[in-house]
Amino acid sequence: MSLELSSNESEDNFRDELVDISGQVSKKPINIDSRQVRLILDHTAFVRGIGNIKRWFNEEYINSNTTRSNEIINLNIYIPTYTLHEFDFVKKGTSISATNAREAIRFIDNYLENEVEMNSDKIQYNLILESPQDNVPSWNKCNHYKVHSPKIKEFPNYKTKFDSSLIGQTPNVNEDSEFNENFDNALTFNQRNKLNDIQYENSASYQNAIANSDNLAEMPVRLRYLIRSCIYKRFIETKKPKIKNEIEDWKLVTEDPITKIWAKSYGIDCLNVNEAELLIFQNYDVNSFRLYNPYANDGDDFDPSTNILQNTIDTTLYSYSSVQDEPVTSNYRGKNNRGRNNRGRRGNKRRERERWPLSTDAVVSEERNESGTGFIKKEKFGAINYAPRGQGELWRPG
């Protein structure tokens, strides 16, 4: 009997089958999500958070903090001209801020001049500087985007000026020119810099700020350049690709509270460096009204009324028990009797104070706050009231 080999077992046929199989495998779709993160950085973000920003470009740190393997983060960083001009001012000197400013300038130069791409498998970078081609609006047009006019009392410690804006100012203690001249000569440059700064509560500048706390604050002039750039990126520029939700819109990263308040008054979301890091790696925006939960799904809807951390209880609304309402216990001895260990009246008085709750009279009082715009409710420490507890048997471990 002869052995007949089928033509299907030829070498050519095996090669064709392998080609077909490889073609089928390559046709399987691979779902890779892409997420846009758009950040505008001012000089304080670099000066106070240069270490955080540099590790955004560190491969090891990225791999240890990203939670999704099938996601690519497109990190867009925009550096306005305002930031570069502030670098020129801050970098002078030997302070830590000056050192960090020079380090930030070197970091930006190395990125822009580096021929090797710094993109990783999980993050694609796009660092750009503000250019003359950007159609930045004039300041008069920017006023159309203003949503709030902040007052002096909205700023921390009523401080509305940058420290550098106070250089060269001297107090008007005396109109005598000879006094002012001698006074200026007796002070160093740094001392003159801090004369009109709000240092402590009893200072004249602090008391003056409280007296005028209801007046509208005045924006530092040079801050307008930053606000203009932010308005252009957030409201005017055509975004490519288009934003999917509010989280992907441009946000200002700053560590300065004055800048933050003014930026928010023009509808610009603000983050600090740590909050920006949450947005990059965890896709969490602190400007949204939800609590950060790394184990929750992005599709979960947050309801503040169902979360205990969002609820507040005013314990002063509950009734206080008076002395007459407190029943006398069987082991109570009169204050003239001696108790165990031969304790006299002093010990009984101490136990009596601990036993009886304070009277409801003058337990809660309301006073005006320092700014005079509202009231604060005070409760005596010894009469702190608690919300009523539910009924039932307390569980105890076996």
UniProtKB/Swiss-Prot annotation:
The keyword Cytoplasm applies. Residues 327-355 are annotated as: Disordered. The keyword Cytoplasm applies. GO terms for cellular component: cytoplasm. Involved in nonsense-mediated decay of mRNAs containing premature stop codons. It is found in: Cytoplasm. It comes from Candida albicans (strain SC5314 / ATCC MYA-2876) (Yeast). The gene is NMD4. Keywords: Cytoplasm, Nonsense-mediated mRNA decay. This is Nonsense-mediated decay protein 4. GO terms for biological process: nuclear-transcribed mRNA catabolic process, nonsense-mediated decay. Residues 335-350 have a biased composition (Basic residues).
